[in-house]
């Protein structure tokens, strides 16, 4: 195993793999994964990858849709990078053998999803992320300068003279290891598992955000958590994602009375932005006292089952026929727009540390991510981070250039002594779902923050006496850390914008809150 590689990549999703491929020709690369290498959010991405390749499309149109969905908070320079550099990187995937669906004349098939003005979403059935990951892993496996350590428990970043110089981790046999490198990339994915209801796999616990925060890096915009409107809503079953592409192909949301309802909430109906659809579903459930369903019975049954084989199979396991039965759906935590603050090259506020993909906050998504932009973000910014990793580390901290909400109430004003009993993972997830979920209030969030602050302190104390390789203790600590950061940010933003909705501040406030919230270890 390389313990003195040139570059370290933590994570094995699209951002980490694309970075490793770019770094391999110039040095030795160590990829650290917390589970099996193919277990990442990338592999669970169904809908597709959005990119302006059609004759009726352009980077300008893609940028406009992205910015509109972001509800006034997108970093427009980052958006330009995404939409302009996306096409060549996606073409590279095609050249490498990615089997995107094609139409009858052999052209790439383009789907439409919510808030897109044209069809621009390339897909591989309903398992696009898995197909992209297959191609990237095939290329990585051919690179002799890239080594992968599976089931590695990363417990901290090595910091010397205010610069990240490597990582501390435990290998799959439980032996402690320190690996030092010129640059370290966080590509650890999302944090959906902080919430009780989520479409994310078990690995998505926000480890990268916690690692960066404890090393001294800034985090940004963590109040913006996207709740996907249509997860399978069967009691006792996992919240399996029911792709937005189903609605893009004509699927309709109906209430328990069989009535379509989305046009009552938004002029774009079933293809309104995700945050709008998610809240509308909950309101419809409350109003009718029943469930909400996705109906595809008016579409061709053969087309539905062939276009969405993975979803059809999961529904079949639940005793449901995707093409004929109303499918019960409801919102679930899906994606975190915020993360470790970075510039457009993945550089964080800590020299030697970079971040790309969902763990990072480039500002490209603003307050609400446009559907199917996540795979594109990982691809583009993973490759760009690899370029920055080859440069000499900056002498000073990175500056993103984004406007900050420095007037926000300091979080110390919200702290209460409380009891130092550590919350269990299940208690954290229940608390976040109930108090920092789709609908937020000051009272609920103040209570959540107080409990999470106390639990954070208790977990820190517990770690001091726990075995250093106690994986459960570290996972609990990371989970509480990220939950605490999300709750703190949500409490401080006194408005509603994008995925952040407060019953006590229901309107968007551009005068006071058209800015980004930053947190770090000193606050």
Residue ranges and their predicted role:
Residues 35-67, 71, 237-240:
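Conserved N-terminal glycine-rich FAD pyrophosphate-binding loop of Rossmann-like flavoproteins
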Residues 74-87, 120-138, 149, 198-206, ...:
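Short beta-strand to alpha-helix junction loop
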Residues 156-178, 320-364, 370:
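FAD-site-proximal beta/loop scaffold in flavoenzymes
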Residues 7-31:
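N-terminal Rossmann-like FAD-binding beta1-loop-alpha1 element of flavoenzymes
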Residues 1-5, 22, 28, 36-38, ...:
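Glycine- and aromatic-enriched mobile tails/lids
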Residues 95-175, 180, 187, 196, ...:
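Conserved redox-cofactor binding core of oxidoreductases
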Residues 37, 211, 217-327, 388-392, ...:
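An anion/pyrophosphate-binding glycine-rich loop and adjacent beta-alpha core
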Residues 183-240, 373-384:
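Glycine-rich loop(s) and the adjacent beta-strand/alpha-helix scaffold that form part
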């Amino acid at each position: 195993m390389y313990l003195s590689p040139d570059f370290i990549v933590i994570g094995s999703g699209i951002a980490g793999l694309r970075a490793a491929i770019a770094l391999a020709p110039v040095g030795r690369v160590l990829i650290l994964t917390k589970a099996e290498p193919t277990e990442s959010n990338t592999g669970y991405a169904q809908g597709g990858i959005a990119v302006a390749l059609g004759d009726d499309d352009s980077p300008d149109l893609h940028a406009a849709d992205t910015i509109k969905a972001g509800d006034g908070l997108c970093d427009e320079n980052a958006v330009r990078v995404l939409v302009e550099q996306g096409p060549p990187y996606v073409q590279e995937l095609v050249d490498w053998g990615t089997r995107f669906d094609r139409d009858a004349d052999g052209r790439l098939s383009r789907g439409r999803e919510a808030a897109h003005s044209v069809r621009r979403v390339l897909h591989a059935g309903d398992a696009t992320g898995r197909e992209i990951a297959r191609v990237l892993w095939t290329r990585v496996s051919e690179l002799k300068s890239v080594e992968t350590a599976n089931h590695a428990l990363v417990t901290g970043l090595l910091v010397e003279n205010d610069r990240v110089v490597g990582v501390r981790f435990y290998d799959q046999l439980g032996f402690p290891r320190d690996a030092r490198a010129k640059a370290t990339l966080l590509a650890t994915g999302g944090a959906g598992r902080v919430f009780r209801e989520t479409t994310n796999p078990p690995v998505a616990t926000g480890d990268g955000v916690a690692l960066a925060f404890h090393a001294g890096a800034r985090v940004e915009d963590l109040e913006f958590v996207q709740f996907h409107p249509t997860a399978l809503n069967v009691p006792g079953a996992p919240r399996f994602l029911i792709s937005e592409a189903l609605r893009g192909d004509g699927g309709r949301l109906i209430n328990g009375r069989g009535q379509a309802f989305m046009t009552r909430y938004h002029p774009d109906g079933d293809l309104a932005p995700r945050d709008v659809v998610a809240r509308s579903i909950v309101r419809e459930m409350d109003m009718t006292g029943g469930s909400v369903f996705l109906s595809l019975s008016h579409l061709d049954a053969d087309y539905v089952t062939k276009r969405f084989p993975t979803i059809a199979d999961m529904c079949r396991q639940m005793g449901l026929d995707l093409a004929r039965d109303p499918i019960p759906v409801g919102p679930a935590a899906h994606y975190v727009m915020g993360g470790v603050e970075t510039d457009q090259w993945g550089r964080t506020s800590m020299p030697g540390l970079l971040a790309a993909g969902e763990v990072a906050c480039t500002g490209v998504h603003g307050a609400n991510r446009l559907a199917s932009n996540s795979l594109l973000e990982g691809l583009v910014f993973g490759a760009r981070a690899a370029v920055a990793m080859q440069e000499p580390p900056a002498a000073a901290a990175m500056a993103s250039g984004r406007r900050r909400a420095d007037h926000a109430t300091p979080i110390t004003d919200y702290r209460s002594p409380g009891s130092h009993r550590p919350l269990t993972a299940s208690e954290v997830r229940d608390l976040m779902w109930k108090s920092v979920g789709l609908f937020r209030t000051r009272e609920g969030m103040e209570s959540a923050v107080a409990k999470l602050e106390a639990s954070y302190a208790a977990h820190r104390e517990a770690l001091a006496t726990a075995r250093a390789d106690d994986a459960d203790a570290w996972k609990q600590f990371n989970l509480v850390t990220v939950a605490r950061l999300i709750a703190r940010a949500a409490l401080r933003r006194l408005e509603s914008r994008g995925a952040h909705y407060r019953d006590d501040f229901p309107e968007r406030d551009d005068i006071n809150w058209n800015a980004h919230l930053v947190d770090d270890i000193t606050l």
